[in-house]
């Protein structure tokens, strides 16, 4: 199947999933990154009059803002702003005041969880479903926040490699500034995905596509997949209670 044909299928997949849930449309959080840009374009195609993109800045960079604005202007994306910085700072202070030791990644992941809460509030208000943005690479290695950006109703890009997401962005007319930008979750200043992961998306793509046999890459990807298994599964339950 050609990628363009698959993108058409994804539009129908989104429509059908919403219909089955007896919902009216979809909501998507946009970040200035390529994955959310692609999903926003698919959302617009699926529900031209019943979708909302939400920009939720929390110490977001100037580059984040510039890229999300280019997406809105160039692709005609309908978006609202929900400023979460003060909410995040209040939360951060409350955790600190509780004498809980500060953990850099845990605090950073709280940003994703605040955004998830925001998206579900917008979704429930409008009878929408929440669209996720994880691609195959991110899903396989668990590069998403549990009950944060991983807390969604559907994941349209979950079978697409990162390079296929880039190609999808070109097909859908996403701004080149977003396509060429270094992938970042914007967890903290100057953070990039690849520097945090210790591996490149090109390497992950190649491994998942069966194109390379590099033991270092295989070991790293397999390790990340194993330790993130809990993110892809539901809550762990004990054995069933047998009533007499």
Swiss-Prot record:
Taxonomic superkingdom: Bacteria
TM spans (from-to): none
InterPro entries assigned to the protein according to its UniProt record, in alphabetical order: NAD/GMP_synthase, NAD_synthase, NH(3)-dep_NAD(+)_synth, Rossmann-like_a/b/a_fold
Annotated Pfam families: NAD_synthase
Reaction(s) the record says it catalyses: deamido-NAD(+) + NH4(+) + ATP = AMP + diphosphate + NAD(+) + H(+)
GO CC aspect terms: cytoplasm
A molecular function (GO) term: NAD+ synthase activity
GO BP, one annotated term: NAD biosynthetic process
List of residues binding ATP: 29-36, 133, 162, 184
Pathway: Cofactor biosynthesis; NAD(+) biosynthesis; NAD(+) from deamido-NAD(+) (ammonia route): step 1/1
Enzyme Commission number(s) from the entry: 6.3.1.5
Residues at which deamido-NAD(+) binds: 113, 146, 153, 230-231
Subunit structure: Homodimer.
Function: Catalyzes the ATP-dependent amidation of deamido-NAD to form NAD. Uses ammonia as a nitrogen source.
Database matches in HAMAP family: NadE_ammonia_dep
Homology family: Belongs to the NAD synthetase family.
Name of the protein in question: NH(3)-dependent NAD(+) synthetase
Annotated organism of origin: Mesoplasma florum (strain ATCC 33453 / NBRC 100688 / NCTC 11704 / L1)
């Amino acid at each position: 199947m050609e990628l363009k044909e698959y993108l058409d299928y994804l539009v129908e997949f989104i429509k059908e999933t919403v219909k089955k849930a007896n919902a009216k449309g979809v909501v998507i959080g946009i970040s200035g990154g390529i994955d959310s840009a692609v999903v926003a374009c698919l959302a617009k195609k699926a529900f031209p009059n019943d979708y909302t993109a939400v920009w939720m800045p929390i110490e977001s960079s100037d580059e984040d803002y510039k890229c999300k604005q280019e997406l809105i202007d160039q692709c005609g994306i309908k978006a609202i702003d929900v400023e979460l910085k003060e909410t995040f700072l209040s939360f951060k202070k409350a955790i600190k005041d509780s004498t809980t030791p500060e953990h850099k990644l845990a605090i950073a992941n709280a940003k994703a969880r605040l955004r998830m809460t925001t998206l579900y509030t917008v979704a429930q208000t409008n009878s929408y479903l929440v669209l996720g943005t994880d691609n195959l690479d991110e899903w396989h290695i668990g590069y998403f926040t549990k009950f944060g950006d991983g807390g969604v109703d559907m994941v349209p890009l979950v079978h697409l490699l990162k390079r296929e997401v880039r190609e999808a962005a070109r097909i859908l007319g996403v701004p080149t500034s977003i396509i060429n930008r270094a992938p970042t979750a914007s967890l903290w200043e100057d953070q990039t995905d690849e520097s945090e992961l210790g591996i490149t998306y090109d390497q992950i793509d190649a491994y998942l596509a069966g194109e390379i046999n590099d033991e270092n890459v295989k070991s790293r990807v397999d390790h990340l997949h194993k330790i993130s298994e809990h993110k892809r599964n539901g809550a762990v339950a004990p054995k069933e209670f047998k009533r007499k």
